[in-house]
Amino acid sequence: MGIRENEHRAANLRFNGKEIQLAVKMLDELETTIDIIYYLMEQEKEQSFVLMLLTAQGVDLNTLLNKEKRETDILFEIDKEESLYVMLCQDTKVDGGYRFAERVIRNIQLDEGKDIFCTELEVRATHYSAKHVILKLLETFVKSRLTDKSNEIVFRSLN
């Protein structure tokens, strides 16, 4: 059976129904935590942070991420069935976030995981709303999947 005409994505449509549901889950899970991190940044107790959105199949991603994370990192299980997780890494800049993602992807591959998609977003300032940050992370992730950037780290910064 072929694709119905209305099932084709319009060029200006960013999220399909499933991705909007995912956005709602991510907003519910992350928004308050990012607001707290923003408070710490404004009090000069934090400088920047990195959000990593990661999925992989054929590996226990929850266990692997819990083993790799630092005490200050916060792990969020967004969708257990889809093996989709967000890690918030406090006091982390581009280099640290990228190296962490490299290590995680290498360990996923060693455990014979597949279909690995990893997007990271560095946040250096508090002038973006938490909602904007979360939706930008998801938008970047969706684009990385559409362009088949499997086994790559797609990294963006918000200044």
Task: List where the protein language model places each region.
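Regulatory and interdomain segments flanking nucleotide-handling catalytic cores
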Residues: 1-159
